[in-house]
Amino acid sequence: MWARTLQHHTRNGQSRRLLGSWANLDVTKMSGANPAQAYNLVNGKWHLPAKSKTIPDPYNGEEFVKIPDPQSNEVSDYIKSLQAVPKSGVHNPLKRPERYNLYGDVCSRAAIELRKPEVADFFAKLIQRFSPKSYPQALAEAKITQRFLENFSGDSVRFAARSFGQSGDHPGQQSNGYRWPFGPVGLITPFNFPLEIPALQVMGALFMGNKPLLHVDHRVSLVIEMFVRMLHHCGMPVDDVDLIHGNGKVVGEILQKANVRSTLFTGSAKVAETLAVQLRGKVFLEDAGFDWKVLGPDVSNLEYVAWVCDQDAYACSGQKCSAQSMLFMHKNWSAAGLEDKLKTLAAKRNMKDDTIGPVITWTTEAMLAHKDKLLQIPGARLAFGGKELQNHTVPKVYGAIEPTAVFVPLKEILKDQETFKTVTTEVFGPLQVITEYADSEVNDVLQVTERMEAHLTAAIVSNDALFLQKMLANTVNGTTYAGIRARTTGAPQNHWFGPAGDPRGAGIGTPEAIKLVWSCHREIINDVGPIPEGTALTQT
């Protein structure tokens, strides 16, 4: 559990003493008896509304954090702050271009800060307190964020906003394409990556010249507050970002009343579609990820592939938008004993080292009920797991089950729409569906992937060139790994991560993703002459 991790990684509070003044809380001392207090930020000022609400510790239920709970009559400052931002943004290629350099400098300083072991350790432990995962998984968030900041240090921010020129039809004419900001924007992100997702997205919004209203799931939002405080310490103007804790309904009201020009939402498909209607389509979405993996006919590296499958399905207790939700095994893999190896690996996961732990958005009862519903499908069987974790103190508002897999025959998955809907329901926890197929059923596998609604990540585990060609040519997932080392999880800073097949689809992490989500194209055609003498001014 997290307490053991803290004990292992902290030596007499040394890391705490080395932190800068921006880190105004002690991760090790947050408890029901000593709750931490989060603050809202608007127009550069930290403040508290009249009410706060408490958040239960995922491990023991203690109310260990107080979160601001602003009401509808308390958010006028947020609305005015966003309304004060022009459509042309805080900066753009023609207005205050020195701010591109400013953010290159901020990134450089922030990367240096996050490179400090005590700072990375602080964020890793803070993440563990709110979004339970193992220390290596939590530390990876800090490391990825640090690498992202390194990537955009120096001139890289203005390089990301690079314009282009095109010659015209006559002397004095030239067209120039610019990446133009939206101005006032919204940014809403979920609980499962409380640092990496909001940090990378808010920086992208700022790079392009927008002013974002930042809202992270209130159950984990203290993490991003600490990141914003660190950015202030590293030179970011204090009024460049507004941060609001609290409930999503009030945030939605702010976005509507302020008439923000665009909003990035990462989270559930249901909320995404509701928000798209409320904001009249002015959204980018990175929503539900019912992600699949296909193991091709060529069996090799069995131990490694089994390990990756286990990591994809159960790391962070399955609470990744890229987690492996369905595994298609070629019969050759079944014959090689893959399922038994998955069962053995799953059995090793435990709460002592946080390789399995609390589930934030699904209760134990809900996950086990879904497991039972899957088992009602003809031919379905429990491959492993399927029980509540033993001897835990996870509060009932959260969930705690063993790593679980239910085998469902491929023909049954395709039998009718109701069964298909049940099988492809995303459980944001340690539960996956597995099935198998023969050479003659490859098209059936493709039919399943075609009928799915979510197209975020996928993995095709094979080095068979013809098999890869067929699978890649007939699928659409925006982030697809292919080859014997393919995985579904992994959203590093060095490649695009996002869905495909939806014009609202958002990406994260790369210059291309930032330009797509946080800027639009503007063309300016300069036509200064000279006007040729004797030009016939004929009306047409």
Predicted regions located by residue number:
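Conserved C-terminal structural/oligomerization subdomain of aldehyde/semialdehyde dehydrogenase
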Residues: 4, 19, 60-66, 96-100, ...
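Generic secondary-structure signature for well-ordered alpha-helical cores
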Residues: 84-91, 112, 116, 132, ...
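ALDH superfamily catalytic-core signature
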Residues: 230-235, 258, 270-418, 440, ...
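Rossmann-like NAD(P) dinucleotide-binding subdomain of oxidoreductase/dehydrogenase enzymes
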Residues: 128, 159-305, 501
